[in-house]
A protein has these predicted regions:
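Acidic, Ala/Val/Gly-enriched low-complexity intrinsically disordered segments
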Residues: 5, 13-16, 33, 169
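N-terminal loops that bind phosphate or other acidic moieties
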Residues: 37-166, 170-248
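Charged/polar low-complexity intrinsically disordered segments
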Residues: 13, 22-23
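Short, Lys/Arg-enriched N-terminal segments with co-localized hydrophobic residues
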Residues: 26-36
Length: 249
């Protein structure tokens, strides 16, 4: 068996390696003459703790302490959840536009979206993400209304294409809050409008759609996600991803 590119040894005597020190042992990273160490850092977010940009900064800081002569490049990545806006902005430019909206638990939160020409990139996690949950608040009672408020503002200032990054949601309302913020009405059995949450979706008996989203002048709406789960069923989004938010489904 050939020598591993990353080997573990208790005695860092080899002249072609740099000891990478951990509390209980040394790792040897071979250095080949004429080839400097190059490190590429590509972290996604650490759900509920670090965004991809924060993770990249921490990893890069530690790497520079161990390998001060290394060529290090950081490219935070995202899958449609936390950090998507920062990833797109770093790759494509654009300007962050701040906005205050309703958070998933009804609180006011400071959010933002990314403007690139006539396109607005909206990150659901910036308005209804897991990091915005209040302690003890059930995801069956959370709302995506803040996401709709961002979209409404983006349309109001002239954006004609809306791209929504769907990951990292703290909600189970099937986007009803988002639709309500854009003028859609959800009706109960008596025909009265109300705002559905995951706990009250079964009470919806009728829907009045906002005509703004139909016709030749309707904005273009696109969604970003990295899964193909259906809405419901054993492998459905409600069952699989609702449990990440601690919903009992």
């Amino acid at each position: 068996m050939g020598r591993s590119a990353l080997s573990c040894s208790s005695s860092p005597e080899a002249s072609d390696s740099i000891p990478f020190r951990f509390p209980t042992r040394h790792f040897q990273l071979p250095i080949f003459e004429g080839f400097p160490v190059k490190i590429l850092i590509l972290p996604d977010s650490f759900k509920g703790s670090l965004t991809s940009s924060q993770a990249a900064a921490q990893i890069e800081s530690a790497a520079r302490k161990v390998f001060p002569e290394a060529q290090i490049e950081s490219f935070p990545i995202a899958d449609g959840g936390e950090g998507t806006l920062e990833m797109v902005q770093k790759a494509s430019g654009g300007a962050f536009l701040p906005i205050e909206v309703m958070g998933p638990c009804g609180q006011r939160v400071r959010s933002r979206y990314l403007s690139i020409g006539e396109t607005a990139i909206v990150e659901l996690a910036e308005a209804a993400g897991l990091g915005l949950r209040l302690p003890g608040f059930s995801p069956m009672k959370t709302t995506t209304i803040g996401v709709g408020q961002i979209i409404a503002e983006a349309l109001h200032v002239g954006h004609r294409r809306i791209v929504i990054a769907l990951g990292g949601s703290a909600t189970t309302d099937c986007g009803c809050g988002m639709a309500a913020a854009l003028g859609t009405q959800f009706l109960d059995e008596a025909g009265r409008p109300f705002l559905p949450t995951g706990a009250t979706l079964s009470m919806v008996r009728g829907i009045r759609l906002n005509g703004f989203f139909f016709g030749k002048n309707a904005p273009r709406i696109e969604a970003l996600c990295d899964v193909d789960n259906p809405l419901y069923g054993p492998q459905g989004a409600a069952c699989v991803f609702g449990q990440i938010g601690r919903a009992h489904v």
